[in-house]
Amino acid sequence: MSYWTDRQEQLKQSAEKSEAALKKRLEKFYDAEFKRLNKEIAAYYQTYGYDNVIEYRRLLQSLSDEDRTLLMERMDDFAEKYPQYANLMPVRESIYRLDRLQGLQYSVFMTEAEIAGYTNEQIEEYLRRLSQQGLNYGMETLGFGKNFYSINDDIVRQFVGVPWCNGENFSARIWNDTKKLAQYLNQDLAQGFARGDSYDKLVRNLRQRFGRVNRKDAYRLIYTEGTFVMAESTMQPFKEDFTKYRTSPVLDGKTCSICRNMRHEVFEISERQPGVNFPPFHPWCRDSWEIVVDDWDAWIDEYVRKHGGNPNAASDVRKPSEVRWNKIQPKNRLPSAVGAVNTVLTVLGAAELIKYLLGGDEE
C-alpha cells in the first residue's frame, strides 16, 4: 500500500466518523419534528374526533382563524430562518381557503420543510470540512504540508453544491425528496381519515414512512455526495503535474460490477466526469482513484523541467514527517543529488519523494 493509498483510507475513515456524528444529529432533529407533528394530529383527534375517530366530513370544514394564524406564523418563522428557501413556501392567499384537512397537510409540509432546511445546513457544513480535508490530503502527498488550505468560500464552491448529477446539486435533491415525501405523507393522512383510522393506527403508519424515508434519503445523499467531494477535492492538487488516473474500488463482496470493471480502465484527468468515468458511479458509491504514470523517469525529467530545470535547486516541497529519508533515495541517481539540507529538498528530491508517496517505487 502506497503512502497516498493509506492517506485516502484515512480520509475515508475520518469521513465515516463525521458521517456517524451527522446521522445522530439528523436523527435527533427528525424525531423532534415528528413529535411536534404527532402533537398536532393528537390535537385534531381531541378537537374534531369522537371515540378516537374523526368523521371525514368534519375535516372539510374551513380552518379556524387560530389555526390559520399559527400556520402563517410558522411559515414566517421558516422564511426568517431559511431566507434562501422562502420562495418554496405556499402563497399566503391560499391559506385563507384551506379546510381543516388541508391545514393539517400544510403542517406536514412545513415539518418536512424544516427537516429539509436543517438537513441542508448540516450536510453543507459536513461537505465544507470534507472538501478542505481532501485538498489538504492531496497537497500533503505533493509535499506541501498537512494544512495548506483553510476553509474559504472560493474553495468550497469548487466542490460543495456542484450540480454534478442530472443537473442538480444536493440541495435541489433534498427539496425534491422533501416534496415527494410530503405528498406521500399527506396521501396517507387523507386516506387514514377516510378509512376512519384511530389515532394510534394513523400515527403508526405515518411514523413508519416518515422515519424510514427521511433517514434513507438523507443518508444516501451524505454518502454519495461525500464520495464526490472526496474524489474531486483530492484530485485538484494533482491536475498540474499528472495527466492520467484509474479508479480504485473497495474490492469485497459488496463491490458492484460497475466499480469492479471500471478499475481496469485508465482515463485522462482532464476528461473525468463523475458518474461516467470518475467516482461516484452510483448512489452509495465510495470508490476512490489513483494516479497512473506510464514512465516515471520521463515524468521526473518533466517535473524538473517544469520547476526551473535545475535538479539540484532548492524546492518548496517538504517530506511528511513519518517518511524516512532513505525511502526517497533514487536507485539510479547519486544520493548527493537528492539529499537534504536540514529539511529542504532539491527539485529532483521532490520528484523522487512524490514518486515514492504515490507508489511509483512499487511498480
Residue ranges and their predicted role:
Residues 1-121, 125, 208-212, 216-363:
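Activation/maturation switch segments at domain boundaries
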Residues 92-208:
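Structured, charged N-terminal subsegments at the starts of enzyme catalytic cores
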